[in-house]
Amino acid sequence: MANAGLQLLGFILAFLGWIGAIVSTALPQWRIYSYAGDNIVTAQAMYEGLWMSCVSQSTGQIQCKVFDSLLNLSSTLQATRALMVVGILLGVIAIFVATVGMKCMKCLEDDEVQKMRMAVIGGAIFLLAGLAILVATAWYGNRIVQEFYDPMTPVNARYEFGQALFTGWAAASLCLLGGALLCCSCPRKTTSYPTPRPYPKPAPSSGKDYV
């Protein structure tokens, strides 16, 4: 019998991680402009995401420019885009598969073994989704660190981690944790041994010798 509480907890955590991945992908604050080395207070805040770059004025006005040319994008940005989209799509598949395998659902009630397998498969897909999101965010974050400490990068052209990047890391952690809980919610099979059957005792000898 599967642990319904553990299943539900794992599904909720993984689902929240999937929502976080969507939010992280859509947000434009993957990296924000670093003011290291500036001696003046600027009235602008610049930040970039996977799809656009924005400038926020102190008056509250925000101007964004969408990256319209795919060929002008760096390989890191293209790979991050692809991995985040793959992670989100895997999350969609995992949600449907895990929902079928949830003990609280009425699907596959007649086949308990198949129902547990669906829950484990959904958890495994959530693990793959979390891994894709984690690789994407770590790759992009590593690029920010390399450019920040690169002596060839001008001081006024350096960026730091943005809120969307932290959201992506949190989303990956939730997907991995939720997927692991779903995979562990089904108990291992116990080896059953056949019960010994009593054998009939041999008939007692009459004690007579026949010639």
UniProtKB/Swiss-Prot annotation:
InterPro entries: Claudin (IPR006187), Claudin1 (IPR003548), Claudin_CS (IPR017974), PMP22/EMP/MP20/Claudin (IPR004031)
Membrane topology (Cytoplasmic): 1-7, 103-115, 185-211
Gene Ontology molecular functions: identical protein binding; structural molecule activity; virus receptor activity
Domain of life of the organism encoding this protein: Eukaryota
Keywords associated with the record: Cell junction, Cell membrane, Disulfide bond, Host cell receptor for virus entry, Host-virus interaction, Ichthyosis, Membrane, Receptor, Tight junction, Transmembrane, Transmembrane helix
Extracellular side: 29-81, 137-163
Keyword Oxidoreductase part of the UniProt annotation: no
Tissue: Strongly expressed in liver and kidney. Expressed in heart, brain, spleen, lung and testis.
Disulphide bridges, residue numbers: C54-C64
Region ranges (Interactions with TJP1, TJP2, TJP3 and PATJ): 210-211
Pfam families registered for this protein in UniProt: PMP22_Claudin
BP term (GO), one: response to toxic substance
Main location: other
GO CC terms of this entry: apical plasma membrane; basolateral plasma membrane; bicellular tight junction; lateral plasma membrane; membrane; plasma membrane; protein-containing complex; tight junction
Keyword Kinase among record annotations: no
Disease tied to this protein: Ichthyosis-sclerosing cholangitis neonatal syndrome: A rare autosomal recessive complex ichthyosis syndrome characterized by scalp hypotrichosis, scarring alopecia, mild diffuse ichthyosis, sclerosing cholangitis and leukocyte vacuolization.
Function description: Claudins function as major constituents of the tight junction complexes that regulate the permeability of epithelia. While some claudin family members play essential roles in the formation of impermeable barriers, others mediate the permeability to ions and small molecules. Often, several claudin family members are coexpressed and interact with each other, and this determines the overall permeability. CLDN1 is required to prevent the paracellular diffusion of small molecules through tight junctions in the epidermis and is required for the normal barrier function of the skin.
Family under the similarity heading: Belongs to the claudin family.
The protein's assembly and partners: Homopolymers interact with CLDN3, but not CLDN2, homopolymers. Can form homo- and heteropolymers with other claudin family members. Directly interacts with TJP1/ZO-1, TJP2/ZO-2 and TJP3/ZO-3. Interacts with MPDZ and PATJ. Interacts with OCLN, CLDN4, CLDN6 and CLDN9. Interacts with CD81.
Name this protein carries in UniProt: Claudin-1
Gene coding for it: CLDN1
